[in-house]
Amino acid sequence: MRNRFGSLFSLTTWGESHGPSIGVVIDGCPAGLLLDPEDFIPAMSRRSPGRPGTSPRKEADIVHILSGVYQGKTTGTPISLQIFNTDVKSATYHQQEDRYRPGHGQLAYEKKYGLVDPLGGGRSSARETACRVAAGVIAAKILAHYDIYCLAFLSKLGKESIETYPKLSKEFAQNIYNSPFLSPLDNDSILQTLTHLQNEQDSLGGVVSFITSPIHESLGEPVFNKVQAVLASGLMSIPAAKGFEIGLGFASTDSYGSEYIDPFIIENENISMGSNNCGGSLGGITVGMPLNGRVAFKPTSSIRKPFLTVTKTGEPSIYATQKEGRHDPCVAIRAVAVVEAMVNLVLADLLLQQRCARL
């Protein structure tokens, strides 16, 4: 089982949803980076439950630094981070342990490995993404040294959506962070949709967009290591992710070349582009424009409506998430922090690779 992501800057996550703790080991972080346990709090709080319409599971998600930091600075050695699971309730999973959960990876996992941890999804649980968010904090610090910043936000939930990519600014970022749903969409409309889902015991998918500051470093390579290819690999590894696009993406199939192609212009005595339909990447390499993309998330599979299933002995049965179960009606809201982290992790790795591209 592969639990490592990245090349020069890499992370290895470990732990299960209902185990004592989860964690991550980060390799390749340069020495001298300022790092304090409090640096993790803002990002971890954006992923944590507790917002309106999210899972009632209450995890403090305090990040403990076990290695790789001395006197507030990274030492260049592996950084080990640990997050304790403090609100585990396994009883609801034991009650239906004899049958497969529709929409989950339990059956596939068992067929591949011969056994499975059924408690909260075990290793395949979205609980693992807390480790990615923690590692993403360190990646963001590396990128900040090169004036590269990323912001993710909920751009679609139900009928509410924003199709364009706003320009990244401190004001826009603050508006997103101040929103209970990390979204520029109407908060009242989102809350109404989530309340309806909870009343109907149902769930809904969503879309998370990400935008960056202009990336003047030439990140990515022209063949297998295209920036969008590495982003797709990382972002599509997020639980419940079902689609990825960069720039105009799938909408470009409805465009003429004369409409889609971004013209080159001179701006402030530098070569720039008059539009950014490409999403900031040409030939798989960033070209000084913002990097923009979207990730589609499926509806949460854990809902209280009953579904046909089979038992582990092959008998027809019914599966319904218990009333005591704690799940999100829309995973895309809490996935915002995870998308932002994965983009930062990919870009930090590509940035360090770029340092080795030529003399």
Swiss-Prot record:
Pathway assigned in UniProt: Metabolic intermediate biosynthesis; chorismate biosynthesis; chorismate from D-erythrose 4-phosphate and phosphoenolpyruvate: step 7/7
Cofactor(s) essential for the protein: FMNH2
EC supergroup of this enzyme: lyase
Gene Ontology molecular function, alphabetical: chorismate synthase activity; FMN binding
Cofactor binding note: Reduced FMN (FMNH(2)).
Biological-process GO terms, alphabetical: amino acid biosynthetic process; aromatic amino acid family biosynthetic process; chorismate biosynthetic process
Catalyzed reaction equations: 5-O-(1-carboxyvinyl)-3-phosphoshikimate = chorismate + phosphate
Keywords annotated in UniProt: Amino-acid biosynthesis, Aromatic amino acid biosynthesis, FAD, Flavoprotein, FMN, Lyase, NADP
Residues where FMN binds: R123, S124, S125, G283, K298, P299, T300, S301, S302, R326
Domain of life: Bacteria
Residue stretches in coiled coil: none
Self-association and partners: Homotetramer.
Function: This reaction introduces a second double bond into the aromatic ring system.
Name of the protein this chain belongs to: Chorismate synthase
Gene name for this UniProt entry: aroC
